[in-house]
Amino acid sequence: MNILKHLLVLSALVLFISCAKKAPDLINLAQSNLDQNRENDAIENLNTLLDKYPNDSLASLAQYKLASIYKNWKNDPANFIKSLEKTVNNYPNSLHAKQAKKEIASFQDWIINNAETLRKRKLTSESINNLIYLVENFPQHELAPKAQYIVGDIYMNDLRDFEKALSEYRVVLSNYDGSKEEALAQFMIGYIYANVLKDFAAARKEYQIFLDSFPNHELHPSVKFEIEYLGKDINEIPALKHITS
């Protein structure tokens, strides 16, 4: 009986050893997962490698590959930057850490570019989420005003949610005064009231704020023209009358 028991234990041990995946197996399996667009499985296998073999020579590759998945497959800026930072902190002397440092330095630029790419692909919610992540986590960064302005632009031109667009443009005014996006946001607020909502009193007020605040802006002549002919039919505007004649 004891011999049988020992044989069963030995068989189970052999089976366990044969089934246990080593670091190279997990790396290869993760790549196979990605080739089949099974990124969640790839993430699981890479995390298994990092948990079981944190000091393996392939660990830095696994950590950096996680960052790549969050960047290129998941469009997940939070986990992307977290994975990059882990690559640098846990494997500081690796080639992957060197590359991760470069990507950390250009992280905010990547968010803007990725958001625009997502927008072109009609992945509007993902685009907005990327931009909001930048604004909320890096409010003092030089690209934060641009990110906030693009959010307003998406609501204006893509989603056609004009009240929300007004709200997002006003965030630019309140949080990023002095930025180049401030004047553009003020103009767009007046434009929406004048040309979309047809609230000419509100449009006049917002346009006047623009004229007073940005007297040297390139849009100044356009705003003066808009104010002069607010609410008028095209036939009542001498400069445009020829269009309908």
Predicted stretch roles:
Residues 3, 18-245:
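Acidic, polar-rich low-complexity tracts and alpha-helical solenoid repeat scaffolds
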